[in-house]
Amino acid sequence: MPAYLFLVLLAFFLLSCAVVSSVNRPESRDNRMIRDVPFYAQETYQCGPASLAGVMNYWKIDVTPDDIAEEIYSRSAKGTLNMDMVIYPQKKGLLAEQYVGNMKDLKKNIDSGYPLIVLVDYGFWVFQSNHFMVVIGVDQDGVIANSGKDKGKFIPEEDFIKTWEKTKFWTLLIKKQ
């Protein structure tokens, strides 16, 4: 039994290191991108506060990931709860709506100048590894996101959809009232 557990944990570790392939994309006419979304590299388990800070500062609400984490980071969950991601910007005077998104919706919102926070799951089998990121661009091959420590990271559409689908396409739109 311990050998089986070791193999499962080893597989989890190896797969988690190679889940998403990304490359820096050259500019093309097909890129839809919001260039002025501030980027905050996340600290450990702080993808929620970093994502919120980027979008809220885009809307000229001066707040840092640390400010946000003080109010909504859950030590027991080692992360941020979805409902807190919605409530926090509302308390700061912004409209925030959580919904089930899709690629067409991402493109429409990016074209309208609305960066979106999405929740993806990089886990496998029964192991969840949820992660918030800010989608700042889309093109015919994938999405461009501020994610973790990567600004403007390209994620191929197939890889993105696979991880986003596991969260039932959780999407958060934040905008001015």
What residue ranges belong to the model's regions?
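Mid-length scaffold segments of soluble, non-membrane domains
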Residues: 70, 76-113
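Active-site-adjacent structural segments surrounding the nucleophilic cysteine of cysteine proteases
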Residues: 14-78, 82, 103, 122-125, ...
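Bacterial N-terminal signal peptides
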Residues: 6-16
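Short beta-strand segments that buttress and anchor functional surface loops
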Residues: 118-123, 145
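Short, surface-exposed coil-to-beta transition loops
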Residues: 128-132
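Positively charged n-region of N-terminal signal peptides that target proteins for export
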Residues: 1-5
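Noncatalytic regulatory segments and standalone regulatory/sensor domains
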Residues: 18-23, 115, 136-177
